[in-house]
Amino acid sequence: MAIQRYMKNVRPDAPWCPDNIEFIRRINGLDSVEDVKQIVLDASYFVFGLGDVYLGAPLATPLDPTHRLVTTKYNPARTWTAEGSVGIGGSYMCIYGMEGPGGYQFVGRTIPVWRNKGFAHLGDEPWLLRNYDQIRYVEVDAQELLLLREACSNGEYFPQVESVELD
């Protein structure tokens, strides 16, 4: 919906419209959009900052340089981005912690990273992620994502968290 709004109200001829993943594929010289998807799913993203976009939004980059996708940001920025959107801008990945403007190229959507009631399994902080965390994505269909997002918002779902050492 954000891309359609952007095309209607801001810049209908932008090179990343109507498909951000196709745009990422082209500027990274990949053979298919499946290649983009596989790189995102195979990557382990290292969180080195929070709040880049709003409310606990992680700023992260893949640990393995072969998983780094590089892309431009929207110019001008979108006036609306859905909460939980996952995007890449430059070589960084971000998850939008709230609805608002934005410019990262969309690669997906995930569970909320900000919860006013806190995440009980993480010490009741309102943000899901911390500096030095690693993020791995798992592909789910739209219906499963809706159920996971609702369960997470209600405090009934907790993402898998494990301790690992960086080498």
What residue ranges belong to the model's regions?
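Conserved "landmark" site that anchors the functional core of diverse proteins
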Residues: 1-167
